[in-house]
């Protein structure tokens, strides 16, 4: 059983790696990132390709996820009714801020983007790729969530993710755990997180935690406003922060609890377990 569990863990690690960025990976890069032999990685990739979870680019030979996992995730997300219930609030925030509005949900010890609304119709429009996983130390959303956790837990999560190397994100990205701890103290004190040319050059963002269980509990999600730094002056920051916190409170008030699992939910979960077990065998 331990061997099977280990193989399943490797399978999930492989899937999570391929989901980090919207690009294809070469076999050697996957092997290096996972710390596994190329032969073991190739066997997993071959199994996942045969079941339709992964595909190999015919020209480069690189590997990437198919849309199958995204479709399954969307089905799970829709079952929570979160997109339907939060859409009007996110739309209102986008209309009032005239900037890009995004929402991310806490999944274990990470944040994942789940929704966005574009509030800017003309001029310079900020529209980044919606990569699933949110980088925690350099984003307003990441800091907004981490600030709601006990400091020791927040620092542990941050250390496990690691401080990004210089040049990977924006020019003002946090470069040490100590600097992140100070930023979380500021975020906790004012109730919202900020990123100013940290995630991307020329981009600023403000995010607030969504806390359905009360103001002193860990957030279950975050919502944010983001746009060019030229539209995030001192007065703009105050205004955006107020709008974002109001939206976060409104979402918290209607946050849906997951309803009882239906037969189709259980069948879907069973199918996934069976197919991953085959991939790991």
Model-inferred region functions:
Residues 260-281:
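Signal-transducing coiled-coil/dimerization helices and immediately adjacent hinge/linker segments
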Residues 54-56, 103-104, 210:
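A structural signal for short hydrophobic beta-strand segments in well-ordered beta-sheet cores
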Residues 1-84, 249-257, 278-279:
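N-terminal helix-turn-helix
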Residues 17, 33, 85-96, 102, ...:
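Amphipathic alpha-helical regulatory segments at dimerization interfaces
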Residues 172-250, 267:
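Extended hydrophobic
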Residues 60, 64-163:
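Amphipathic alpha-helical effector-binding/dimerization core
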Residues 4-8, 27, 62, 66, ...:
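Short, structured helix-loop boundary elements
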């Amino acid at each position: 059983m331990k061997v099977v569990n280990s193989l399943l863990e490797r399978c999930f690690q492989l899937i999570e790696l391929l989901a980090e960025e919207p690009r294809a990976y070469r076999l050697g890069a996957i092997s290096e990132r996972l710390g596994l032999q190329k032969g073991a990685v190739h066997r997993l990739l071959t199994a996942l390709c045969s079941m339709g979870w992964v595909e190999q680019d015919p020209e480069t030979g690189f590997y990437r996820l198919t849309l199958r996992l995204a479709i399954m995730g969307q089905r799970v997300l829709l079952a929570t009714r979160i997109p339907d219930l939060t859409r009007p609030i996110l739309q209102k925030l986008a209309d009032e801020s005239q900037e890009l509005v995004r929402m991310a949900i806490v999944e274990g010890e990470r944040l994942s983007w789940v929704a966005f609304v574009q509030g800017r119709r003309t001029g310079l429009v900020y529209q980044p790729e919606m990569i699933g996983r949110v980088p925690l130390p350099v984003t307003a959303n990441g800091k907004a969530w981490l600030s709601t956790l006990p400091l020791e837990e927040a620092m542990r999560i941050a250390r496990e993710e690691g401080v990004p190397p210089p040049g990977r994100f924006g020019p003002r990205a946090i470069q040490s755990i100590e600097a992140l701890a100070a930023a979380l103290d500021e975020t906790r004190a004012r109730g919202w997180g900020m990123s100013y040319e940290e995630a991307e050059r020329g981009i600023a963002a403000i995010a607030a935690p969504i806390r359905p269980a009360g103001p002193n509990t860990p957030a279950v999600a975050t919502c944010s406003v983001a746009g060019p730094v030229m539209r995030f002056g001192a007065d703009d920051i105050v205004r955006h922060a107020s709008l974002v916190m109001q939206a976060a409170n409104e979402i918290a008030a209607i946050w849906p609890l997951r309803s009882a699992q239906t037969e189709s939910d259980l069948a879907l979960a069973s199918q996934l377990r069976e197919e991953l077990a085959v991939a790991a065998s």
